[in-house]
Amino acid sequence: MAKTLGLHILADLYGVDADKIDRVEDIRELLEGAVKYANLTKISSHYYQFQPHGATGVVLLAESHISIHTWPEHGLATVDVYTCGDPSKAYRAMDYIITQLNPKRIDKQVHERGIVEEESNQSEAEKLRSILLQV
C-alpha cells in the first residue's frame, strides 16, 4: 500500500492590496502568524526587502517550509506551503495566508510528494490470505 510523505500547496494570489505585501515587516508577521495558526514547528526564517517594491520570506520548518515572494506593483503574491506529517497543517497555514491577504483571485495547486510503498510486517502468506478474503 502506498502512502504520501508530504503535501505541497502552491498558490498564486492576484489582486492583493499592495500595502499588505510591500513591506518585509508585514511579510514576516504574515508567515510567523501562519506557522502559529497551523501549529507548525519553526526552525529558522529569513526575509528580504526588495527595492523599490516587494519582499520575500521563507520559514524553515521541522515539517518542511513556507515561502512567499511578492510583487506589490502587480498585486501578486506567490506562496508555497510544504509539510510532511499531518496534511491539515498545510491547509491551515495556506488558509491563514489567503484570509489575511484577501486576494481577488487564487490559482492553487496541491501536490502529494514522496509517494512510497508502506512497509508491512505481514508475511507473504498473510498478505495472500487477506487478498483472498476480500474476493
Swiss-Prot record:
Domain of life: Bacteria
Keywords assigned: Autocatalytic cleavage, Decarboxylase, Lyase, Polyamine biosynthesis, Pyruvate, S-adenosyl-L-methionine, Schiff base, Spermidine biosynthesis, Zymogen
Catalytic activity: S-adenosyl-L-methionine + H(+) = S-adenosyl 3-(methylsulfanyl)propylamine + CO2
Cellular component aspect of the GO annotation: cytosol
Cofactors required: pyruvate
Pathway: Amine and polyamine biosynthesis; S-adenosylmethioninamine biosynthesis; S-adenosylmethioninamine from S-adenosyl-L-methionine: step 1/1
Gene Ontology molecular function terms on file: adenosylmethionine decarboxylase activity
Pfam families the UniProt entry points to: AdoMet_dc (PF02675)
Post-translational modifications reported in the UniProt record: Is synthesized initially as an inactive proenzyme. Formation of the active enzyme involves a self-maturation process in which the active site pyruvoyl group is generated from an internal serine residue via an autocatalytic post-translational modification. Two non-identical subunits are generated from the proenzyme in this reaction, and the pyruvate is formed at the N-terminus of the alpha chain, which is derived from the carboxyl end of the proenzyme.
Function: Catalyzes the decarboxylation of S-adenosylmethionine to S-adenosylmethioninamine (dcAdoMet), the propylamine donor required for the synthesis of the polyamines spermine and spermidine from the diamine putrescine.
Quaternary structure note: Heterotetramer of two alpha and two beta chains arranged as a dimer of alpha/beta heterodimers.
UniProt-recorded name of the protein: S-adenosylmethionine decarboxylase proenzyme
Organism: Aquifex aeolicus (strain VF5)
Lineage of producing organism: Bacteria, Pseudomonadati, Aquificota, Aquificia, Aquificales
Gene: speH
